[in-house]
Amino acid sequence: GSSLKFTVGKNKYIKDRGYAFEKKLSENTNHILNVQLKDFKSDEAQAKVPLLLFNAVVKGDGKKMVLSTQPMSFMMKPFALQQDTSISPDAVDFAALFKNQQPMNLRLLSALRMNATFPYVLPNVWLPASPVIDVMDAGLRDNFGQEATLRFLDNFKEWIELNTRGVL
């Protein structure tokens, strides 16, 4: 029945433990996280708020899925290997992959859950691809975010040197 589904925009989804988790997290944070990626995209692009970067792991192949409001294709391979065509990317840019499915409509609560979907505690998140892609906790590949941090810093090394006093 309809009580087993919920709607975001024009899309309907099944209520499961993931839905219950997101609902409770929203309640516990006074609904401040109940926004969509598109709601802070402009502020991030203008550097009014920090850039949020979320990671998940694609269960089928172990690739990292990078979620952000800004283009992240530069994060798909280590910086030193970006020009090496013999090495395939080991990550996927969520917004680029789902460009036809309104990726900026993703709720921040869902991005947080995708980043922290620990097996058996929460169900994997199933994404609208063919074949279906399911993702889980990013900790499988990069529990502390070191890989993502180093890739990001490597890509912006020159900019950081020219425009900041450094990175702690």
Language model segments and positions:
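Catalytic domains of lipid- and phosphate-ester/thioester hydrolases
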Residues: 1-168
